[in-house]
Structures are given as C-alpha cells and as structure tokens.
C-alpha cells in the first residue's frame, strides 16, 4: 500500500502513530531509506550513498509505557531473537544484492548490555552465513558524530539498527542530501509492504503549494517496482533525477522557485517522454 504523511500528537491518550500501527499489524519489519545525493544537489559534506535499515516492529515503539505514579513513568524496550534475526538477514541480503561489502550494526551495547548485547550477538550469528559481507558494530553516539564529520566513510554500506536508534539516525542522514523532502522509504515484510515519504506532515504549509514532492513521487515509484511494474518505476526515477539535475523546475528547498505542482508536472512530463521512447 501507499501511505501519505500523517500527524501524530505527542500527548497521552491520543491515537497511536498510523505508520507504527500499520508496521506492527502487517508485520512490516524492515523500514528502508536510501540516502543518496541527487545530481546538482551536493551538500557541504559531499556526496553520500548508503542505505538505512531500521527494525520497525518492536524496540521502544511497542507502546509498552506505564505511568507508575505522579512522579514516575517507564517505557519497556522489547528486543526479540526473531525480530533481530530477520532484520539482520534483510540487511546482509541487501548488501549482497547491491554488491556492497559491509553492514554496520548501530547500537549502545556498552550501556544497554542486555538488549543491545542480545541484538549484537544475533547479528554476529547471522553474519556467519555471509562470508562475502563484513559487519561492524558502531556505538550510536560515535556513528552520529562520524555522520557529520566524514559521511563518505559509510558509502556503499548498509547501516542497520533497532527501531528508535535508526529512526533518529536516518533523520540525521536525510540532512546530508539537502532536504528531507527527497527521502523516500519502504516498509517491507514477508507478505506485505507499505511505501511512504520519509518525512512527516507539515501542516504549516497546507494549501501553499510549495513543498518538495520528490519523496512522495519516488515512494510511489518504488511501490511500482515492488508490484512488478519496473518499466514505469524506472521511468519515474529517471525523470525525477533529470528534473533535479536540470534545476529549472525544483522547489525552494532545492534552490529553485517551482511550486509543488510545477515540479510534479515536470517530472510527469519527462516520465511520459521516457516511456514513449522506450
């Protein structure tokens, strides 16, 4: 399915996150965000090309929170062998499929010795079945620092972690390509998948026709590839990259002056031309 941005209120006794609920209901355990510099949009830290893989069904996002008293609340971090095994396999399989050589397991095992220690042990066990792919544990604080000092060290790597850690890291990584409006994502399970732009909602821009449509368009294109419409998907991806490279019909966050609809129409026109020629 395809899901657009929604707002989740931060107060107790309000509805849960739509995305989190869908991931858990349909067991969409792999939240995947490609982080790749777009043409003509190289940021101050240079070109990047890696993938963030996030376990999407448990961790601190299981909703196991309790108010013990007026002065104390707790949240339970759930880490299971099943979830760790399948997200590790997904990351290693993706690295192998892409011909990349390393999976990075982001953790805080020196402090969270039980939960992250368990996670790392399972990753190590899974890694034994992938002799062609290296793996490296990385403390989350160090990874976050290196991501803004020398992000190229992670190029052609799969960065993988538990739910909350990778939620934060993938947002930080999105800044490396200039705009969260360019980051598309997929939530993959064994039977179902959900595709969505990585960014949340932005009610302050309602009706202004100014936000970047790239993530929305490319999430849909990725869904087309998932359901077997590779030719259509490839045409939309190429058209989007071409429009951004040309720079004439892009939104303000990409240093342009186009509206949302103008950029979307430019991509649609170019995709139609590509399909007509093929």
Language-model segments: residues:
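N-terminal glycine-rich phosphate/adenylate-binding segment common to multiple enzyme folds
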Residues: 1-74, 164-168
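Short, acidic/small-residue loops that bind anionic groups at enzyme active sites
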Residues: 20-38, 129-139, 182-196
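Short, glycine-/small-residue-rich phosphate/pyrophosphate-handling segment
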Residues: 37-64, 78, 82-83, 200-234
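Glycine-rich phosphate/diphosphate-binding loop of Rossmann-like nucleotide-binding domains
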Residues: 69-142, 155
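Flexible, glycine/charged-enriched surface loops at secondary-structure junctions
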Residues: 98-107, 130-138, 229-235, 245-257, ...
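Glycine-rich phosphate/nucleotide-binding loop
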Residues: 146-248
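Phosphate-binding loop/pocket of nucleotide- and phosphate-handling active sites
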Residues: 259-278
């Amino acid at each position: 399915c395809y899901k657009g941005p929604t707002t989740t209120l931060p107060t107790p006794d309000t509805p849960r996150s739509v995305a989190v609920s869908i991931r858990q209901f349909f067991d969409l355990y792999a939240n995947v965000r490609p982080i790749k510099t777009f043409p003509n949009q190289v940021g101050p830290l240079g070109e990047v090309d890696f993938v963030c893989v996030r376990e999407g069904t448990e961790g601190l996002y299981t909703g196991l929170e309790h108010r013990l008293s007026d002065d104390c609340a707790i949240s339970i971090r759930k880490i299971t062998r099943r979830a760790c095994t399948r997200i590790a396999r997904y990351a290693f399989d993706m690295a192998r499929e892409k011909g990349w050589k390393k999976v990075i397991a982001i953790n805080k095992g020196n402090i969270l010795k039980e939960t992250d220690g368990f996670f790392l042990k399972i990753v190590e066990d899974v890694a034994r079945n992938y002799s062609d792919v290296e793996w490296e544990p990385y403390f989350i604080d160090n990874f976050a620092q290196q991501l803004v000092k020398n992000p190229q060290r992670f190029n052609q790597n799969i960065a993988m972690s538990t739910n909350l850690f990778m939620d934060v890291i993938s947002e930080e990584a999105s800044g490396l390509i200039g705009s969260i409006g360019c980051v598309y994502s997929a939530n993959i399970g064994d039977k179902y998948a959900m595709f969505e732009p990585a960014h949340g909602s932005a009610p302050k821009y309602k009706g202004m026709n100014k936000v970047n449509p790239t993530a929305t368009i490319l999430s849909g294109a990725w869904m087309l590839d998932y359901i077997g419409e590779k030719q259509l998907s490839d045409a939309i991806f190429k058209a989007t990259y071409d429009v951004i490279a040309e720079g004439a019909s892009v939104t303000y966050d990409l240093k342009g002056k186009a509206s949302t609809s103008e950029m979307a129409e430019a991509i649609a026109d170019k995709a139609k031309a590509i399909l007509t020629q093929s």
